[in-house]
C-alpha cells in the first residue's frame, strides 16, 4: 500500500457522498510563498552576510551542506512559521523549500536533517556570535540608500521563559519564572532591527546597558558621522552610565522614562495641585505639562525632566521623562517618549510571531545563535513588507498575516527539462495581490 493511502481521513458526508482525505496528492507544497523570501534575501543578502561571519570548522571532505545552505534552510523555515528545529526532518524534501535553498525540487538533493541543524546551532563560538552581531549592523546600515538625518535607538528587554536547565537562566521575581531577558534594539521610525542580545534573566545594570549601547553607537557613527541619534527607553534604562555615554557622544541624545520619587513629586506638586483642582471643578480628565530641572544624588549634573501632571477618573497620574534635548517643550518630549509603544509591536513580531523564545539549547551560545536566526527571519520579513508590500493592503500587516496570506500558499510543483512550474490553487483569493508583490520585488 502506498504511504499516503495509509493515512486516510474521514469527514462528514456531503450530499450523501463520503468525504475522505489522504496524503497522496503528489508533489505539493504548503509554503510556496517561501520563494518571495528567497527573492528578497537575494536582494538584501541576509544569509550570505551572516554566513560570512561564521567559521566552518567541519572537515571539507565530509560536508554535504554548506553553511549558507544550512542557514538558508533554517531561516526560511522560521520565515514560514516552522520554529522547531525538529521540523527539518519533515521539510527537508519540501519542493518549495528546496527551491528556496537553490536546489531543484524533485531531482535536487534533500535538505539537511534535524541532527545536522542541531549541530549547526551548537557550533558557533563567542567570536562567531560577535561577528554575527556586526553583520546585523552592516545589514541595518545597508538598508538605507543614504545616511539618514536622524535615527531612534529604541531599546527594551522582554522575558524569555525557559523550562530546562539552560546556562545563565535565572529566576526573575517580577516574571515569577526562570527566564532569559534578551535586549532588543530597533530603529524607532522604521522598525528595522539593529540587534538582539540574549541576556541572563535579570534586569541589566547601567554598566551593562552602556557597554552594549557604546558598541552600537560607535559602529553606527563610523558609518554615519553626521546622523543624529536619539536613545529611547523606559525608566530602567535611565541610569547615570547611559546618560553620561549619550552626553559624551557627539550628536547623541536620550529620551528615557524616569521613575518618580519624593523629590520629583515635590518639584511637580504645584502643577499637580492645579490639575487636581481643575479636574474637580470640571469633572473631567485634565492633563498639563511642564519642564523641571533635577539632579539625583548619583548624577554628575542637573538634567531636564519633562513632567506630565494628569488626573484621570479622579486619580492623579504623574509621569516623568528625563532628556538631554532642551529646545523642545515638555509636551513634545512626553509624546515622543510615548511613541516608543511601537517598540512593543516590533518585539511582538519577533517573539510571538517568529517564536524567538524557543531557546531550549543547553549552551548559552547556542541559544544566542538561535535568537540571531530569528532576527534574520525578522529582517527578511520586514524588508519584504517594506519593499514588496508597499502600497498594498498588506503594507502595514503583521508578520502573522503575511505568513497566512502570501507564504502559506499551496502549490503543485513540476520539474521540467528547462524550467520549474508551480501551480497555485485556482481558488486562491489574493491573486492580484501576489502579482503586485512579485512586480514590486522585481523593482526593489
Region spans (language model):
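Short, glycine/acidic-rich hinge or "gate" loops at secondary-structure transitions
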Residues: 90, 104-106, 228-230, 389-398
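Short, surface-exposed basic-aromatic patches at helix termini and helix-loop junctions that form
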Residues: 243-252
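Acidic/histidine-rich, metal-coordinating catalytic segments
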Residues: 156, 227-238
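Short amphipathic alpha-helical "interface-anchor" segments enriched in bulky aromatics
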Residues: 40, 88, 330-369, 373, ...
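Dynamic "connector" segments at or just before major functional cores
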Residues: 1-204, 208-223, 248, 385, ...
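An anionic, glycine-rich sequence signature occurring as long contiguous blocks
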Residues: 2-23, 253-352, 438-444
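Basic, amphipathic alpha-helical segments enriched in Lys/Arg and hydrophobic/aromatic residues
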Residues: 356-427
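Short acidic (Asp/Glu) and glycine-rich catalytic loops that position anionic groups and cofactors
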Residues: 13-19, 50-54, 95-99, 313-317, ...
Amino acid at each position: 500500500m502506498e504511504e499516503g493511502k495509509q493515512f486516510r481521513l474521514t469527514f462528514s458526508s456531503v450530499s450523501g457522498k463520503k468525504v475522505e482525505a489522504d496524503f497522496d496528492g503528489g508533489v505539493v507544497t504548503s509554503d510556496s510563498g517561501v520563494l518571495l523570501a528567497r527573492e528578497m534575501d537575494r536582494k538584501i543578502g541576509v544569509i550570505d552576510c551572516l554566513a560570512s561571519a561564521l567559521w566552518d570548522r567541519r572537515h571539507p571532505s565530509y560536508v554535504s551542506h554548506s553553511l549558507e545552505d544550512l542557514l538558508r534552510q533554517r531561516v526560511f523555515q522560521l520565515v514560514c512559521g516552522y520554529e522547531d528545529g525538529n521540523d527539518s526532518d519533515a521539510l527537508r524534501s519540501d519542493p518549495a523549500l528546496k527551491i528556496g535553498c537553490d536546489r531543484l525540487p524533485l531531482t535536487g538533493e534533500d535538505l539537511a536533517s534535524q541532527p545536522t541543524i542541531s549541530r549547526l546551532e551548537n557550533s558557533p563560538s563567542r567570536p562567531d556570535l560577535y561577528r554575527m552581531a556586526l553583520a546585523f549592523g552592516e545589514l541595518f546600515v545597508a538598508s538605507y540608500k543614504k545616511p539618514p538625518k536622524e535615527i531612534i535607538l529604541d531599546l527594551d528587554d522582554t522575558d524569555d521563559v525557559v523550562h530546562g536547565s539552560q546556562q545563565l537562566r535565572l529566576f526573575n521575581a517580577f516574571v515569577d519564572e526562570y527566564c532569559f531577558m534578551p535586549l532588543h534594539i530597533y530603529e524607532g521610525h522604521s522598525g528595522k532591527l539593529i540587534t538582539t542580545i540574549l541576556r541572563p534573566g535579570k534586569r541589566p545594570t547601567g554598566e551593562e546597558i552602556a557597554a552594549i549601547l557604546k558598541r552600537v553607537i560607535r559602529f553606527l557613527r563610523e558609518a554615519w558621522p553626521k546622523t543624529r541619534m536619539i536613545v529611547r527607553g523606559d525608566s530602567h534604562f535611565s541610569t547615570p552610565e547611559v546618560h553620561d555615554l549619550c552626553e559624551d557622544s557627539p550628536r547623541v541624545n536620550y529620551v528615557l522614562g524616569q521613575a518618580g520619587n519624593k523629590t520629583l513629586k515635590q518639584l511637580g506638586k504645584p502643577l499637580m495641585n492645579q490639575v487636581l483642582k481643575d479636574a474637580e471643578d470640571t469633572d473631567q480628565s485634565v492633563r498639563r505639562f511642564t519642564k523641571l530641572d533635577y539632579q539625583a544624588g548619583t548624577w554628575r549634573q542637573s538634567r531636564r525632566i519633562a513632567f506630565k501632571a494628569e488626573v484621570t477618573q479622579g486619580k492623579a497620574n504623574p509621569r516623568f521623562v528625563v532628556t538631554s534635548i532642551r529646545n523642545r517643550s515638555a509636551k513634545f518630549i512626553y509624546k515622543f517618549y510615548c511613541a516608543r509603544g511601537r517598540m512593543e509591536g516590533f518585539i511582538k513580531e519577533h517573539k510571538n510571531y517568529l517564536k524567538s523564545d524557543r531557546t531550549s539549547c543547553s549552551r548559552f551560545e547556542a541559544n544566542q545563535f538561535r535568537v540571531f536566526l530569528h532576527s534574520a527571519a525578522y529582517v527578511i520579513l520586514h524588508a519584504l513588507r517594506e519593499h514588496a508590500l508597499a502600497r498594498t493592503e498588506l503594507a502595514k500587516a503583521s508578520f502573522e498575516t503575511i505568513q497566512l496570506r502570501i507564504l502559506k500558499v499551496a502549490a503543485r510543483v513540476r520539474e521540467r527539462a528547462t524550467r520549474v512550474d508551480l501551480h497555485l490553487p485556482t481558488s486562491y483569493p489574493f491573486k492580484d495581490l501576489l502579482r503586485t508583490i512579485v512586480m514590486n520585488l522585481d523593482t526593489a
